Amino acid sequence: MPNTARWAVTLTLTATAVCGPLAGASLATPNAAASGLYAPSALVLTTGHGQSAATATPERAVTLNCAPTASGTHPAAVSACAELRATGGDFDALSARSDAMCTRQYDPVVVTVEGVWQGKRVAYERTFANECVKNSYGTTVFTF
């Protein structure tokens, strides 16, 4: 009987030593996956000359992905994402730079934004008086 008890204890300790780390890793996997979840923020920005998006032909388009990290074809993706985060994704809250000096020439430029910002659909359109005025708004968001 003492040998049987000794074997039982030895097998239990061996099984715990071998299987214990495996059980811990499998229990940690759901927490690791949960911390990697995020709301998507992926946008397509276009620009073209005209009064509205319906009449303007898109001349340039860029992509802007802000989650989990800033990326895309936007030339200043990191700073554009930072500006949008600061306004909570509100494009109307982007203000003009105070140091911009633009002429009063009227050559309308329309910018459109389509996509998803922090999990919510976005459809935005804004017409600027000219290219200089467009580039002065939002510092880098509309500069592409």
UniProtKB/Swiss-Prot annotation:
InterPro entries: Prot_inh_I16_SSI, Prot_inh_SSI_I16_CS, Subtilisin_inhibitor, Subtilisin_inhibitor-like_sf. Gene3D superfamilies: Subtilisin inhibitor-like. It is found in: Secreted. The record marks R104, Q105 as: Reactive bond. The keyword Cell membrane does not apply. Disulfide bonds join C66-C81, C102-C132. One of its GO terms (molecular function) is serine-type endopeptidase inhibitor activity. It comes from the Bacteria. Residues 1-34 form the signal peptide. Keywords: Disulfide bond, Protease inhibitor, Secreted, Serine protease inhibitor, Signal. GO terms for cellular component: extracellular region. Transmembrane segments: none annotated. The keyword Zinc-finger does not apply. Belongs to the protease inhibitor I16 (SSI) family. HAMAP family: SSI. Strong inhibitor of bacterial serine proteases such as subtilisin. Homodimer. This is Probable subtilase-type protease inhibitor. It comes from Streptomyces avermitilis (strain ATCC 31267 / DSM 46492 / JCM 5070 / NBRC 14893 / NCIMB 12804 / NRRL 8165 / MA-4680).
